Design a protein with these regions (language model features):
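An N-terminal assembly and electron-transfer interface module characteristic of large anaerobic redox
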Residues: 1-314
Length: 314
């Protein structure tokens, strides 16, 4: 097991290994819907890809909340969305594009498919299954099992835009500060940034990557080591630590991570991002955190010193 998590620098050149090819392959057949489920981060990335390719009429966003997973309502909500899709003209089938959250929570996707009222095939992908599954090969097998097409989904209808997740807004906000922005994630969540517009091309962000075994064994210590090493090379004043859906669902010990980093001389300001909330919510919380952050040498408002004094005088 690694002593430090894999740390990757955000790049606008592309997300996961198969992220660009799998949706395109599904949309080649005009009667198939791609139903994207998971946190806002997961669904937003696929929404942007559908918009770029002119395939929004073949895209079904199914974002779920942390409460949906925690209360066991995810399968129920997904089944309801697919039953709605079954009533749309021209829909011959659905590829349910499952996320890490469904894998982690063991959502009963087979039951969802049975209740949909139309042919549904499940594609598992993402960092938690990449070690053991070949998504490209599985997709080809899945596509071969659909009945022959009898029509196409008409153009003209499109879902409402999927909002960017909280950490997207916070990462953008931190670009103007002397911060080392770090996203704690299993690895696939930056697709919602990668597939955006040109404004994200120079985004300064580093993020972790874990597989299923590393997450199962506990990865807080590895995260601390990875962040500490990255921060040491960054030359920045503090680490802006953000989270995403999988660390949130796992109940990762952010407090312990923050304390361990502080012991190693890394100033950390944690932003309570989950990937489930929207960017405006994340920015609102971030501004509140920045406005009240107390450093040892004094009180800072929006990262600027209000006055210079000793901590004992406050």
């Amino acid at each position: 097991m690694r002593d430090a998590c894999r740390v990757e620098v955000y790049s606008a050149e592309g997300g996961g290994k198969h992220f660009m090819t799998l949706p395109e392959r599904i949309w080649q057949r005009g009667d198939l819907l791609l139903a994207a489920t998971g946190s806002l981060a997961c669904v937003r990335a696929l929404y942007l890809r559908a918009a770029e390719l002119g395939k929004l009429h073949q895209f079904l966003p199914c974002p779920l909340t942390r409460a949906d997973y925690a209360a066991g309502r995810a399968a129920e909500h997904l089944a309801a969305r697919l039953r709605e899709a079954a009533r749309r003209p021209g829909v011959g089938g659905v590829v349910l594009y499952a996320s890490c959250a469904e894998v982690l929570t063991q959502c009963d996707l087979e039951q969802v498919a049975e209740q949909a009222g139309l042919p549904v095939r499940i594609l598992l992908r993402g960092p938690l299954v990449a070690r053991t599954r070949n998504a490209v090969a599985e997709l080809e097998q899945i596509l071969s099992t659909f009945p022959p097409p009898v029509g196409e989904i008409p153009r003209g209808s499109a879902p409402l835009p999927v909002l960017p997740p909280d950490f997207s807004g916070v990462a953008s906000l931190l670009q103007s500060w002397d911060a080392y922005p770090f996203l704690l994630t299993a690895g696939g969540c930056t697709g919602c940034l990668t597939l955006g517009d040109d404004a994200t091309a120079g985004l300064r962000l580093e993020h972790s990557r874990f597989d299923d075994l590393e997450l199962a064994a506990g990865c807080e210590a590895a995260a601390v080591n990875g962040i500490a090493r990255g921060f040491a090379h960054s030359g920045r004043a503090f680490c802006g630590l953000m989270g995403s859906a999988i660390p949130e669902l796992l109940g990762m010990d952010y407090t312990g991570i923050q304390e361990s980093l502080a012991e190693r001389g890394v100033p950390v300001l944690r932003f309570p991002c989950t990937g489930f909330e929207s960017a405006p919510v994340g920015v609102d919380r971030a501004l509140r955190n920045l406005a009240t952050w107390r450093r040892p040498e004094g009180l800072f408002v929006l990262n600027k010193p209000l006055f210079i004094t000793q901590k004992t005088h406050l």
